[in-house]
Design a protein with these regions (language model features):
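Short, intrinsically disordered terminal tails adjacent to the first/last structured region
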Residues: 1-60, 64, 642-646
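Membrane-proximal envelope and lipid/glycan-remodeling enzymes
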Residues: 39-44, 51-646
Length: 646
């Protein structure tokens, strides 16, 4: 098949550089071998869909892709060198085990609370663990490497296509090189968390947008992929919206067939993007009786804390001097966007800048909510996105592009060899202390292994040993009995003799309150009900109000009084230093009043069709329900001021 070329004919008017289409007034004849394809304006104002919108030399993309191998190899070597699984990943592992055991995608058996905020990642792990005889821990590590590689390849192919269409020669993906040398990226390329899938989604979304704009086809599959972002991380709904908006602008441009169908094309893109997220949202409402994951409520994801968010941003930028390569990369993008704009390539500029907009909206959200307690983690999507369009072509490497390109290359070498994040020492640590940690280094130290991946590795840490002890305690509970363990000092060893009788319709043998639920919960097993003191997996605590800002993700700290009120046997004593009987009585009163009582019934009762339908209708009120973490205050709020305080 011959190479596609465009032979311009006489135009009826000068090129309109202000339109969003490319050379829409030029009528051309496309030659491919002995075949002639015409494109242009028909009488009546309709247009033929052109075979292609830009000259792309055959094989140009293949010839220019090889520089992607450099950042790809660097990031994979770094990720493997830093391979590990974060303690939080074991939350998903426990959910996967419960799912595969037939209990549903839940953290505590018998209680439908959505603790996983990354359902696509979690379900992918479940499928792979079912198909391949590999432990969940190593499945997550290997999947992370594959997704990271896929994200880098997709992003590299995207800029290679852009460079080939503009005849820039071999493309140097400086932005991907910039990302590949940052140690924070290496840590979360594995980690067992969903960040690698975010890289894959960003790279594929950019690549598909480039292909759609170039080929004037394939918009619906691209929209479906864009919509998947919300199933990887909730806040990616912002970036997904930007990508879908860009797709709508592209399909609304001339060159897509009959003009009268423009509205249907745009509607189709939006519908395709929303299809899977809407289906899952309906499932979430019917199954979990909520509009958002429990983790979103527990982390107060709608509250503002700009000052801490700024601190979190600087904590990521400063150790690697990221402001320097990002500023240089911005110059590269600005020079290219300006040149394309002047030639009338408005859609090309839109495609080029879409990843920048995705990164900026994600960055603003993360900073607005106060960031995270893990160094770099929540800023990596924005970093990867804004770096995607930062590239240079060998033929265009002149003038204003030379200095920024050399600067990024030199910085990359320095960052690769020397720039690392070292957290400052923390004095007087309390559960409410605000600090940003290097989670990998912390767990390397706690487990005594260079690569903490498996449950066996974590079993060497205090939390791992505690989980193993709880599993053993649960096995020794007499058949038909339930026990309750109240931990008043999370830093003290667990006392197996401190258990008290419990009663509940939930199928557990031992219930315990814990400040960390990942490794402990995973090793404790499904027979242990984990009452999460920080509310991620706590259907009561996640709906409490935030008294004051604390460490991001750890603001809703609730005491064991709610657990005693829900599962304890009235009249039994509690552990020394535990909540008073008055406080427990107030919590028990609050638990009996709607909407809290109705919500707990909705997520613990049998999931019949009628209950699923009722959950759909009640999910809004259940999601917006809030009350004080203080049981005495909550009793008045939930039961009404006419109820006397106990």
């Amino acid at each position: 098949m011959g190479e596609l070329t465009l032979v311009p004919k006489v135009t009826s008017r000068p090129l309109d550089t202000g339109s969003w289409g490319r050379s829409t007034t030029i009528t051309g004849i496309a030659h491919r071998g002995n075949t002639v394809v015409t494109s242009g304006t028909k009488p009546g104002g309709t247009e033929d869909a052109p075979e292609t919108s830009r000259k792309v030399p055959a094989g140009a993309g293949l010839r220019s892709w090889w520089p992607v191998a450099v950042p790809l190899v660097v990031v994979l070597i770094g990720a493997w060198t830093y391979r590990w699984v974060d303690e939080d990943a074991f939350i998903n592992f426990r959910i996967v085990h419960n799912l595969l055991a037939g209990h549903g995608p839940v953290f505590n058996v018998g209680e439908r609370v959505e603790v996983s905020s990354d359902p696509l990642w979690m379900f992918t792990l479940a499928v792979l663990h079912t198909v391949f005889p590999v432990s969940l821990e190593w499945t997550s590590v290997l999947l992370g490497l594959v997704c990271t590689a896929g994200g880098f390849l997709a992003g590299g192919f995207a800029v290679a296509r852009l460079g080939a269409r503009h005849d820039e020669g071999t493309v140097l993906p400086l932005g991907l090189l910039m990302v590949s040398v940052v140690a924070g990226v290496w840590e979360f390329a594995t980690s067992g968390l969903e960040m690698s899938m975010v890289f894959l989604w960003l790279g594929c979304s950019f690549l598909l947008l480039v292909r759609v704009e170039a080929r004037r086809a394939g918009a619906l599959p691209a929209a479906v992929v864009a919509g998947l972002g919300t199933l990887i991380r909730p806040e990616l709904v912002l970036g997904a919206g930007v990508v879908v908006a860009a797709l709508v602008v592209v399909v609304a441009a001339p060159g897509w067939g009959i003009e009268k169908s423009r509205r249907w094309r745009c509607s189709g893109v939006v519908a395709a993007a929303l299809a899977l997220p809407v289906v899952y949202e309906l499932f979430r409402m019917a199954y979990f009786a909520m509009l958002v994951p429990s983790t979103a409520l527990a982390k107060a994801a709608t509250s503002s804390w700009w000052s801490e968010g700024g601190t979190y941003l600087w904590n990521f930028v400063s150790p690697y001097t990221l402001w320097l390569p990002l500023a240089l990369g911005a110059v590269i993008v600005a020079v290219r966007a300006t040149a394309w704009w002047r030639t009338g390539d408005r859609l090309g500029v839109l495609v080029l800048c879409t990843p920048l907009l995705v990164g900026l909206v994600d960055l603003l959200y993360v900073v607005e909510v106060g960031g995270d307690y893990m160094h770099a983690r929540l800023l990596l999507p924005a970093f990867f996105a804004v770096a995607l369009p930062m590239y240079v072509g060998v033929r265009s490497l002149r003038g204003a592009l030379v200095f920024p390109s050399i600067g990024i290359a030199v910085w990359s070498v320095v960052c690769l060899g020397w720039l690392r994040f070292t957290p400052p020492p923390i004095a007087g640590l309390t559960p409410q202390t605000v600090f940003i940690s290097n989670e990998r280094d912390s767990w390397v130290s706690a487990t005594g292994t260079a690569h903490p991946v498996t449950a066996t590795d974590y079993g060497r840490a205090l939390s791992g040993r505690a989980g193993t002890l709880l599993a053993r305690m649960a096995r020794h509970v007499p058949p038909g009995h339930q026990e309750l363990l109240v931990i008043t000092n999370p830093f003290a060893p667990i006392d197996p003799s401190a258990t008290r009788p419990a009663r509940s319709t939930l199928p557990f043998t031992l219930a315990v309150n814990l400040p960390a639920i990942g490794v402990i919960g995973y090793l404790a097993g499904p027979d242990v009900y984990v009452y999460d003191s920080y509310s991620l997996a706590n259907p009561i605590g996640s709906h409490t109000t935030v008294a004051r800002h604390a460490r991001p993700g750890h603001e809703k700290l609730v005491g064991p009084s709610w657990m005693l009120a829900r599962f304890g046997v009235p009249g039994t004593t509690t552990a020394p230093g535990g909540p008073s009987t008055v406080t427990v009585a107030a919590a028990r009163l609050a638990l009996g009043c709607d909407p809290l009582a109705a919500y707990l019934h909705a997520i613990t009762g049998s999931l019949t069709l009628s209950r699923a339908v009722a959950n759909l209708g009640n999910s809004v009120s259940f999601t917006t329900m809030r009350f004080s973490p203080d049981p005495a205050v909550a009793a008045v709020q939930l039961c009404g001021p006419q109820v006397a305080r106990p």
